[in-house]
A protein has these predicted regions:
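Active-site cavity-forming subdomains of large catalytic enzyme subunits
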Residues: 1-170, 174-175
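Short, well-ordered alpha-helical packing segments
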Residues: 3-10, 36-39, 44-48, 53, ...
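Short, hydrophobic/amphipathic alpha-helical patches that form generic packing surfaces
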Residues: 5-11, 167, 186-197, 217-228
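Internal maturation/activation junctions in enzymes
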Residues: 14-64, 196-206, 210, 214, ...
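Catalytic alpha/beta core of large soluble enzyme barrels
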Residues: 79-82, 127-174, 179-201, 208-211, ...
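Short linear motifs in exposed loops
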Residues: 91, 297-298
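Short linear clamp-binding motif
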Residues: 501-504
């Protein structure tokens, strides 16, 4: 983990400049427990981190299974994730099968490969691929059987890869306008396909591109899109847990229709471009990113996930006096010290210009695009079950995603067994599951101070918006930014991972 030790040195002003994915063997007990007791509390309730384990914060840890795990194994993993946030399972055979879609061209072949791999081992699966679809060189065969590597957010599969990514903001698109949807996904597909012309200087990346050219077209705001498409009844179905009733079956059929149509548009566009320019076709073109930061640009619910609430305060971390944060102040947004800025008594600072303050939180009142639809206010998003989230995630995984779908399923302690059963069944029945993050769910209305997302009422939202207007001294944000940005490069900007997935402060412990 030397790379994580190096990463610690480039974290500036609490702004993450490193993100990693560390994949360990399923039987590596030391790796499985590496992050246990990472955080502890003193007598006053203040959190501190074990300095010997500080570098482990720089990456996610995943255990890779090459056989189908038992229900008990999955249950233990889900339980561990509830208590520590770590211990995720990755099912490698599904990842390898998807990454060989140029030869495993349908579900039956994919499932046959997975069964051979899981029951007879990797070597037998390798021989089966070579005898059925080869012969391949040893180098290419090694590459094909190693395509279960993940990028830091888990949405791209490959081996020695760089992947060109693009994203469609579905919350900006009319569900009834298929032509608009087609244009958006076609534009995204072309924007990544053209980068396949790039030639890497590093030999191993050149070889990987030669064997396995990959692109990834993602979307964000799927939840918003579906609310606009199906209305409040869809939200109520979610609130009921997405049951398998007649109405639910109709909703799922329509969801699948949208997802599959977008996938086909992307693949056809990328392949047409590659054929025209004599490039090898990628065998997987679609993915879903976590989309935390980019979703802020249009107020989209990130990726496939539901939003935190219909209305909330969004807090974004900046270093103190960052030009963007200063421009936000001129634009009317409030700024407060971050969670890591405290006085000598451990109390949060209130004045962003206090000399002891090193980081700022810009507070932005946010309203989702469907907040004012009749009945939408009556839906408690925070009560959406883990199984409902998992079901929607698997819809995306089955009907749109060809790589993997970046997912964080939030769950409560009483949902551990049900969620473990759902994951185990998805793996056991070859339904397409590879890996997903699981996060213990806190109450959306908990009184923790200065959370990244803080749900608010409609009345609070209107009041905060009025205050933004009152404080505004410049109606042109770009002009305000030019006032403070002198064009110099800085070591820090908006936090790359401004989500609620890492709620504990990143301040270093005192010696």
């Amino acid at each position: 983990l030397l790379i994580d030790e190096a990463a610690v040195t480039i974290v500036a002003g609490n702004i993450r400049r490193s993100a990693g994915m560390r994949q360990f063997a399923s039987d590596d007990k030391e790796a499985a427990s590496a992050k246990e007791n990472l955080w502890s509390q003193d007598a006053n309730g203040n959190w501190r981190i074990d300095p010997e384990k500080d570098a482990l914060r720089m990456a996610n840890h995943t255990r890779v299974y090459h056989t189908k795990p038992s229900y008990k194994t999955v249950l233990d993993a889900v339980t561990k994730q509830f208590h520590s946030g770590e211990g995720a399972i990755q099912f490698a055979p599904e990842a390898i099968a998807r990454s060989n879609a140029d030869i495993l061209k349908d579900d039956e072949l994919r499932k046959e490969f997975i069964e051979i791999y899981s029951e007879q081992g990797k070597d037998e699966a390798r021989n089966w691929i070579n005898s059925s679809y080869g012969p391949f060189s040893e180098e290419e065969l090694d590459h094909r059987m190693s395509r279960y590597g993940l990028n830091p957010c888990g949405e791209i599969l490959g081996n020695d890869f760089h992947c060109n990514l693009a994203e469609v903001h579905l919350n900006q698109i009319d569900p009834e306008n298929f032509e608009e949807q087609k244009k958006a996904f076609k534009a995204a597909a072309l924007s990544v396909a053209c980068l396949l012309n790039h030639e890497f200087e590093v030999e191993r990346y050149r070889k990987s591109r030669e064997y396995d050219p990959i692109v990834g077209v993602s979307f964000t705001g799927l939840f918003d899109f579906c609310v606009h498409a199906f209305g409040t009844p869809w939200l109520k179905w979610w609130e009921a847990g997405r049951p398998d009733c007649e109405e639910g079956k109709a909703f799922k059929k329509q969801e699948a229709k949208f997802l599959d149509s977008w996938r086909k548009i992307v693949k056809e566009t990328v392949w047409e471009y590659c054929d025209k320019h004599n490039l090898r076709r990628p065998n997987r073109c679609t993915t879903v990113q976590p989309a935390g930061t980019k979703s802020l640009l249009t107020g989209a619910a990130p990726g496939w996930h539901p939003p935190k609430a219909q209305r909330f305060i969004r807090r974004i971390t900046f270093r103190k006096n960052d030009p963007i944060a200063l421009a936000c102040m001129d634009y009317g947004y409030s700024v407060v010290p971050s969670q890591s800025d405290k006085d000598e008594n451990g109390c949060l600072l209130d004045n962003p210009f206090d000399p002891r303050c090193t980081e700022w939180l810009v507070e932005i009142p946010t309203e989702v695009s469907w907040a004012n639809i009749d009945g939408a206010d009556q839906i408690d998003i925070n009560n959406f079950s883990a199984l409902a989230q998992f079901d929607f995630y698997m819809q995306v995984q089955k009907f749109y995603t060809e790589h993997n779908t970046s997912a964080t399923v939030e769950f409560r302690e009483n949902e551990i067994e049900d969620l473990a059963k759902a994951i185990h069944n998805a793996i056991e029945n070859n339904e397409g599951y590879i890996s997903a993050a699981l996060l213990a769910r806190f109450s959306a209305n908990a009184t923790f101070p200065r959370l990244p997302f803080e749900p608010i009422s409609k009345e609070e939202y209107i009041s905060l918006q009025n205050k933004v207007i009152e404080r505004k001294v410049n109606n042109d944000f770009f002009d305000a930014l030019n006032k403070y940005d002198v064009g110099e490069l800085s070591e820090a900007g908006p936090a790359g991972c401004d989500s609620d997935k890492c709620l504990l402060p990143l301040a270093k412990p005192k010696d």
